[in-house]
């Protein structure tokens, strides 16, 4: 959702304006603005990729990436939205292999979309728990990650769950008009995950919350492949 990094840019720009005399805070806010701006650019580029996914011409742009850095960038984008809604937000990265070969843009968009949905549909003061943990892999050159996002939001009805990945599908609830969105996100995200050879599952109960779980496998990379020789 383009609004997510835009909200972060606007929010941190306002904080920067109020703290121009504080060099440490100003530098911190500038870094967050830059990070959110880069993510916004990637999302705009992803809009073009959406057409490729639907036409069957999408390909993975693979290179070595640092999962710690990617995880941090994603969460930075949501800091302002989390603060405004006073959400209890927990993020846990529990992995042994931190460098993998992946399509950074698509993987980042998957995380952004899932977490953004949780924030949208979780009322003020409620909680969201995001985790990436490493699971056993039979192939020593590959790593298996499980990404999960669980919220205590409004949830979805049992009748709607089979349709959650359909294009333009949004459940007709009393909150629908209050929450922006096109209904395209999850359909595209599922296509991206399947392009990577992974899977996505959803569990939800109306009035209790929703949990998305994503399984993905990647080739293991070395730190030198990400940052070069230091």
Where are these regions (language model features)?
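Short alpha-helical segment of the dimerization/phosphotransfer core of two-component systems
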Residues: 35-40
């Amino acid at each position: 959702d383009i609004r997510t990094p835009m909200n972060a840019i606007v929010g941190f720009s306002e904080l920067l304006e109020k703290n121009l005399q504080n060099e440490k805070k100003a530098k911190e806010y500038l870094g967050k603005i830059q990070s959110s701006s880069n993510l916004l650019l990637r999302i705009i580029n992803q809009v073009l990729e959406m057409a490729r996914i639907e036409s069957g011409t999408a390909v993975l742009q693979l290179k070595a990436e640092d999962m710690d850095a990617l995880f941090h960038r994603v969460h930075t984008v949501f800091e302002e939205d989390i603060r405004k809604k006073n959400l209890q937000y927990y993020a846990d990265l529990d992995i042994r292999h931190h460098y993998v070969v992946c399509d950074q843009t698509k993987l980042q968009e998957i995380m952004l979309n899932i977490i953004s949905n949780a924030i949208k549909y979780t009322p003020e003061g409620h909680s969201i728990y995001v985790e990436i943990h490493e699971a056993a892999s039979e192939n020593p050159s590959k790593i298996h990650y499980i990404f999960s996002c669980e919220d205590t939001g409004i949830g979805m009805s049992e009748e709607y769950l089979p349709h959650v990945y359909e294009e333009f599908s949004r459940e007709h609830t009393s909150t629908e008009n209050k929450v922006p969105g096109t209904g395209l996100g999850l359909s595209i995200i599922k296509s991206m995950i399947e392009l990577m050879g992974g899977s996505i599952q959803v569990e939800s109960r109306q009035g209790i919350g929703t949990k998305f779980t994503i399984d993905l496998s990647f080739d293991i990379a070395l730190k030198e492949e990400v940052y070069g020789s230091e």
